[in-house]
Swiss-Prot record:
The keyword Cytoplasm does not apply. Residues 216-250, 257-267 have a biased composition (Basic and acidic residues). The lineage of its organism: Eukaryota, Fungi, Dikarya, Ascomycota, Saccharomycotina. Component of the Mediator complex, a coactivator involved in the regulated transcription of nearly all RNA polymerase II-dependent genes. Mediator functions as a bridge to convey information from gene-specific regulatory proteins to the basal RNA polymerase II transcription machinery. Mediator is recruited to promoters by direct interactions with regulatory proteins and serves as a scaffold for the assembly of a functional preinitiation complex with RNA polymerase II and the general transcription factors. It is found in: Nucleus. This is Mediator of RNA polymerase II transcription subunit 4.
Length: 285
């Protein structure tokens, strides 16, 4: 009677797929190998393979069964740690989301910083702006008013008049400044808008002028009175002096009375006329 050969059993442990992707130990990453449960699974797999080989060769090894039991106990112990691994996985997923959010925010910040940097580069430097301002001020100082007026005349002659321009307005239409009539109208309009202020200013000026005039009139009156008194006194002194001289001349007797009379008649022709009159006849006496 011949012994039967090894028949593959459907329940053989060697035929079970230990991993869905049938990865070898070399293909597994080092990070996965560092996990304790993965090492226990590998050890459990190796012992089961050895046991299956011994059973297939009809030489079972009982020590392998003890190893399988030990590996099974370790697997149960590591399975109890799955709760911690689950928590760790949740924490990792949360950190991944947070990292993504931070990455998005940092990307947005970098984009805004880049746009700000570009806009700042487009702007001129402070030193350049100050230099340009100084140059412009120097150029403005050099420009003469006549040049500005000539340029304004050119603009006024060759540009269109505004739609609110009054064609019936008197004055030069080609000038950019208004005519004299429009200036007067503007002054009258401003005066009509500020009636009260102008009236109050005028009244204040009139009051001040009246006070000054009254003081001047009083001074003039006082000076006139003083001058009249002085003149009256001078006239009295002159009259007194003339009376004294006339009186003194009537009592003077000179030897050459004829010569004196002739000199007096030469000096005053009116006296000569009086002497020529025959007011009385000396023969009658």
């Amino acid at each position: 009677m011949s012994t039967p050969g090894p028949v593959p059993s459907s329940t053989s442990v060697a035929t079970l797929p230990f991993s869905a992707q049938d990865k070898t130990q070399e293909q597994v990453s080092e990070e996965l190998q560092s996990v304790g449960i993965y090492q226990d699974l590998e050890r459990y797999e190796e012992t089961i393979q050895q046991l299956s080989k011994s059973v297939d060769t009809f030489k079972p090894d009982l020590s392998l069964i003890d190893k399988v039991i030990e590996c099974d106990k370790k697997l149960y112990e590591t399975l109890e740690e799955f709760d911690e691994y689950y928590k760790i996985e949740e924490e990792l997923s949360r950190l991944d989301k947070e990292q993504k959010n931070i990455d998005n925010k940092t990307r947005e910040i970098l984009e805004t910083l880049n746009t700000c940097y570009n806009s700042l580069n487009e702007l001129p430097m402070l030193e350049q702006v100050e230099f340009e301002q100084k140059v412009m001020l120097k150029q403005r100082e050099k420009i003469h008013s006549k040049v500005v007026l000539d340029y304004a005349m050119k603009l006024a002659k060759f540009t269109r008049f505004p739609p609110t321009f009054d064609k019936s307005m008197i004055g030069p239409n080609n000038f950019i400044w208004p005519a004299e009539d429009s200036l007067r109208k503007g002054m009258l309009a401003m005066a009509s808008l500020k009636k009260k202020e102008l009236l109050l200013d005028a009244l204040d000026e009139d009051n001040v002028n009246n006070d000054n005039n009254t003081s001047k009139i009083d001074e003039m009156r006082n000076t006139n009175e003083d001058s009249v008194d002085d003149r009256f006194n001078n006239k009295e002194q002159v009259q007194d002096a003339t009376e004294d001289t006339e009186r003194r001349g009537s009592f003077e007797f000179t030897a050459n009375g004829k010569e004196d009379s002739e000199t007096k008649s030469e000096e005053n022709p009116d006296l000569e006329l009086d002497l020529d009159l025959d007011l009385f006849n000396p023969d009658e006496f």
